[in-house]
Swiss-Prot record:
Stretches of the chain forming a coiled coil according to its record: none
GO biological process terms on file: bacterial-type flagellum assembly; bacterial-type flagellum-dependent swarming motility
GO cellular component: bacterial-type flagellum; bacterial-type flagellum basal body, rod
Listed name of the protein: Flagellar basal-body rod protein FlgC
Species annotation: Bacillus subtilis (strain 168)
Keyword hit for Glycoprotein: no
């Protein structure tokens, strides 16, 4: 594994975590949106979105097996495989004054839990910071290698 390969792995992780932070930000921004899109002629609330990540190239088990046997490469980084909607039920809130309230006075609110979103945001931020640290360490090693020839 070359130093430039490790930079590419960290860069792919930075991109994936940035997408994850963008999705969490969108979830938090739309946590009160009761009219996100029309389904069968009726407005439905915003649905929480989730990011799925996967490794680029080979699967983890095949990389592990090749490393255990002393051959192969250490992986190619990570990528966003898909962004899916959370199919859990919407939250029902009693507010008969809301224009979106049903006949009983309940309003369907998005299935976004701000606590869950903040945990995801902190997790992706920590992962982002760890990858920046890894990139800086690689950069430091490359700079030291360049100084050897002086």
């Amino acid at each position: 594994m070359t130093a430039f390969h490790s930079l590419n792995v960290s860069a792919s992780a930075l991109t994936a975590q940035r997408v994850r932070m963008d999705v969490v930000s969108s979830n938090l921004a739309n946590m009160d949106t009761t009219r996100a899109k029309q389904v069968n002629g009726e407005w439905v609330p915003y649905r929480r979105k989730m990011v799925s990540l996967q490794s680029k190239g080979e699967s983890f088990s095949s990389i592990l097996n090749s490393q255990m046997s002393g051959s192969g490469n250490a992986g190619n980084g990570v990528k966003v495989s898909k962004i899916t909607e959370d199919d859990s039920d919407f939250n029902l809130v009693y507010d008969p004054t809301d224009p979106d309230a049903n006949a009983e006075g309940y309003v369907q609110k998005p299935n976004v839990d701000p606590l869950k979103e903040m945990v995801d945001l902190v997790s992706s931020t920590r992962s982002y910071e760890a990858n920046v640290t890894a990139m800086n360490a690689t950069k430091g090693m490359l700079m030291k290698a360049l100084e050897i020839g002086k």
